[in-house]
Every structure is written in C-alpha cells, then in structure tokens.
Amino acid sequence: MIKEKLNLNSNLFLAPLAGVTDIPFRIICGELGAGLCFTEMISAKALYYDDKKTKKLLDTDPRENNTSVQIFGHEPEIIAYATRFLTENYNFKSIDINMGCPAPKIFKNGDGSALMGDLNLAEDVIRACKNNTDLPVSVKFRLGIDENSMNYMQLGQICERLKVDYITLHARTRKMFYSGEADWSHIKRLVENVDIPVFGNGDCFTKEDIRKNMEYSNCDGVLLARGAMQNPFIFSDDENKNKEEVIDTIKKHMQLKLEFYEEKRAILEMRKHIQWYLKGFRNSNKVKNEINQLTDLNEIFKILDEFKNE
C-alpha cells in the first residue's frame, strides 16, 4: 500500500492545481490531514532549459513533510533529465507523470492526455522516469482521448509491468474535460485488473462522495482537485467546520501568503480562496463582495472578524 510505503497519514491526496497548490495552500491542506500534497504541474522541458519561473514553483517549506511533484512532457530524454534533476536537488516524496491534462495547449504539444494517443511513447516516458530515480513513481491518466479510444486499461497494465508504484485514473475522457459525470465504474474495473495501487479522481466534493466512490470501486485512495480547492476541510475528519474555524483558517492562510508574496499579490490571490472558504455561509455573499473591493489587509481582517462574530 502506497500510504505505508511513503509513511503517510492519509490516502487522500491534494492534486496539482495551477495557481492554487503553492506553499501556503499545501501547508494548510497538510495540517488539515492531506496525506500527500502536489506542487503545481511542472514542465520537464522548462527544467531542461533552466527556466527560473518554473524552478520557483519547486520551492518547499520546512513545515511541509509530504510534498510531491508532478511533471509533464513527451520526450523521454527530457523526462529523464527532469527526473534526475528533481531527485538530486530536492526532497520530494515521489514523482508523478501527468498523462491526463486535457488543456488545449498541453495536448497540442503532445503532452498530458495526448500521450494516451501513443502508448508506445507513453511507455518510453514512464521508463525514462523510472530508470532515473529511486523515488516512488506514479502516473495520472484519463479514460482515453474520447469515448471511442478508451485505452486506460492498457496504460494501467503498462504501468504495472514497469513497476510504477501507483496510478491515478481520472474517470473522464480528454474530450469531456471536466463536463458530465466521472464514471467510477472504470476505476472499479481498473482496480480489478491491475496488481498495483489505484487512486481514483473525479467528482469527489464531500466526504460522502469519497466514502461512496471508494467503497464502490475498492480503490486505494483519492486524489482531490476541485473538491479540495473549494473546501480544504475535506481532508479533515469533519469537513463541516463552523464559521469561526473557517475564518481562523482564512486568516492563517493569508498570513502564510504574506510570508511568500508581497502584500498586494497576497491579497489578490486570496480573493478566490475566500470565495471558496465562505461558500454556503449565510450572508457570505455580501462579505465576499466587500472583500473583493479591498486592498488593505487590516480592513479585510476587520470584515472577517465582524462576520465571525455575527
């Protein structure tokens, strides 16, 4: 079981999310109970060309002890270089290969889910990563490019043969992006047909979603993306936190942001998180709208404290 192999406290993982899974958010999710937290998705080619902005995304903090990295790319020699670079220069728990990203720019370049259109190349990419690290390696992929080319089972079996440590299946095709419903029957089928740990991904927004889907599919864990982004308390024993706890977490998150970014950027980036944190609370729309107009930290904290004490 990958949870024991990596010495983790949970089989609920935080997925890589561009513009979201920075150090402050990873610290928050880790403290709330996430077993593993991913950096934002990293371009292997950008590492090869020594791109400073990309390398900045690899920064970690001593308060993190459960951080992993996900890379994307389609050239085995570039993947091999990036894997060696990450292994030799950082202290990540594991390396994940993205073969599921549906974004047009990624797909057009032959990366992400485009690799599901060439399983021979996908195999070469996985082998290049495995052969250049002693860290656990995982692969994340989708059902296939579209409903007529669902080859996730073949890719899962390739991963098994190459002794990948675990795999994650997002139960949608590339064509679906994030529309429609994730079909967990495919995750169940994959679990039944490969002898390596399988994590499920797709449409887990509550603890009940997680419980139901894990029980149905018998998967080994869940990778949480939008569900965690919108409610990081999903990692804790009780996802239904009271208003006081949520606002205290917002303020802690803001203070963490201020450690890593200048104040203006921290405030702007926290706006989206505040929208998610306060979702569902009575009268929260008024508070969220007010905060969206503010650029002064003390004013923001004042409004949050007033809302907490209502």
Put a short name on every predicted segment.
Residues 1-310:
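Flavin-dependent oxidoreductase catalytic cores
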